[in-house]
């Protein structure tokens, strides 16, 4: 049975959120979401999870990969050998929104694309697309979160994370 985990370093995120709240209060600009839920928070947590899984021989599935740097931590190749034997003990998933949007889209869409982990750079988006073709990403998910437009239009600290994306699974 695999362990399934969402990897972000909470103390790093909490420190960045506190720093931004000092400056902006509750109305932090949406474009700063990738600074609060940073690439470093993702990489550190993902690296730790993979190190522990490898050390203990644990099957691990990491959810919501959002950076090119995280991709480098995973093995490329098919999930199973031609004889049907499981080849990968550690697998990765990314979400549709990480393949569609990039950091600059926060300026136009604001909290409508606020999700955890945050959408990162265009270069990360491009690397994730390539990772699907290269058998590094094993699962593509929606991470469906049916928040209303009214909820998404609230100030940063009240605007929920997640996007309503179930339609892409159909």
Located regions from the model:
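Histidine/acidic residue-rich metal-binding segments in metalloenzymes
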Residues: 1-140
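Gly/Ser/Thr-rich active-site loops/lids in small-molecule metabolic enzymes
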Residues: 42, 158-170
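Active-site anion/phosphate-binding pocket segments in diverse small-molecule metabolic enzymes
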Residues: 142-150, 165-170
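Basic, amphipathic juxtamembrane/active-site segments
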Residues: 150-159
């Amino acid at each position: 049975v695999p362990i399934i985990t969402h990897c972000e370093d909470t103390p790093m995120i909490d420190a960045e959120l506190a720093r931004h709240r000092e400056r902006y209060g509750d109305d932090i600009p949406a474009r700063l979401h990738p600074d609060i839920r940073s690439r470093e928070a993702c990489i550190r947590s993902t690296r730790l999870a993979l190190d522990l899984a490898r050390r203990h021989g644990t099957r691990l599935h990491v959810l919501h990969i959002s950076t090119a740097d995280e991709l480098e931590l995973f093995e490329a190749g098919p999930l199973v050998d031609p004889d049907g034997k499981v080849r990968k003990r550690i697998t990765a998933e990314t979400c549709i929104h990480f393949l569609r949007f990039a950091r600059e889209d926060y300026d136009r869409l604001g909290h409508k694309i606020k999700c955890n982990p945050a959408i990162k750079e265009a270069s990360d988006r491009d690397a994730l697309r390539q990772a699907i073709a290269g058998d590094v990403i094993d699962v593509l998910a929606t991470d469906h979160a049916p928040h209303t437009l009214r909820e998404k239009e609230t100030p940063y600290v009240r605007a929920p994370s997640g996007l309503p994306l179930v339609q892409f699974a159909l």
